Amino acid sequence: MADLEEQLSDEEKVRIAAKFIIHAPPGEFNEVFNDVRLLLNNDNLLREGAAHAFAQYNLDQFTPVKIEGYEEQVLITEHGDLGNGKFLDPKNRVSFKFDHLRKEATDPRPYEGENAIESWRHSVENAMRAYVKEHYPNGVCTVYGKTIDGQQTIIACIESHQFQAKNFWNGRWRSEWKFTITPSTTQVVGILKIQVHYYEDGNVQLVSHKDIQDSLTVSNEVQTAKEFIKIVEAAENEYQTAISENYQTMSDTTFKALRRQLPVTRTKIDWNKILSYKIGKEMQNA
């Protein structure tokens, strides 16, 4: 092990550490970071070399954060990244600094977004927040309005998690939805992601995703938002139902097939008569 450590350059050590951090299960960033810190045994190298991994993890996981002075949380996503460690809270129209290691928001300042699309963004946000409140008890959503390649685009992100470390499991739901504001009809594109880690007497992870495409009729802001939420609700309900059904099927078939119902002898042992068996006598005489 010592020989291997001598062969690895600092760059290679940081690259390996960054991979561990980026792939940390939901709710277990600190545990993975502390383990990597012990292995690397060089705090300055870890902080400087793996800073991009801290940021990538939060962006990928849609990490929710609360800004002091504001009631609701906002998600850390690539769509709100303003550069130089600053992010956008489109609901409250503020920018803020985000510490990717401590996961803290500071220095909120007024920020003017794209006013031309704000009425659309606001309508979708109101509808999306009502939907998330109904379906995700711990859910957070952030809705952006941006011009991408000359097209006015709405992007809605949802995050919901349950961290149950004392029960040896953690899980997170993420979904991202986009559509452009074009006359008559437009295409809705979504991606749904589930990640769950169970680690009592074992180590099992569920990592699943599904891509969605559908068409949306574009009329006024409020009606379009309602129709958009119908698409979101139908797709997410269908996905969650399919996941549950697959697990039930696996429980009834696949997992049972992994274990013999009878020993190789095809005969069950009567433990009450164990002493009458040869093995029982051998154990008794041992």
Curated annotation (Swiss-Prot):
Question: Is Acetylation among the key words of this record?
Answer: yes
Q: What superkingdom does the record give?
A: Eukaryota
Q: Name one GO molecular function term.
A: actin filament binding
Name the job this protein performs: F-actin-capping proteins bind in a Ca(2+)-independent manner to the fast growing ends of actin filaments (barbed end) thereby blocking the exchange of subunits at these ends. Unlike other capping proteins (such as gelsolin and severin), these proteins do not sever actin filaments.
Q: State the species of origin.
A: Didelphis virginiana
GO cellular component terms, A-Z:
cortical cytoskeleton; F-actin capping protein complex
Any idea what this protein is called?
A: F-actin-capping protein subunit alpha-2
Subunit: Component of the F-actin capping complex, composed of a heterodimer of an alpha and a beta subunit. Component of the WASH complex, composed of F-actin-capping protein subunit alpha (CAPZA1, CAPZA2 or CAPZA3), F-actin-capping protein subunit beta (CAPZB), WASHC1, WASHC2, WASHC3, WASHC4 and WASHC5. Interacts with RCSD1/CAPZIP. Directly interacts with CRACD; this interaction decreases binding to actin.
One biological process term from GO is: barbed-end actin filament capping
Q: Which residues carry this modification: Phosphoserine?
A: S9
Query: What gene does this protein come from?
Result: CAPZA2
Q: Using the record's annotations, give every residue carrying the modification N-acetylalanine.
A: A2
Q: Which family does it belong to?
A: Belongs to the F-actin-capping protein alpha subunit family.
Q: What keywords were assigned to this record? A: Acetylation, Actin capping, Actin-binding, Phosphoprotein
Tell me which Pfam families the record gives.
F-actin_cap_A
Is-annotated flag, keyword Endoplasmic reticulum? no
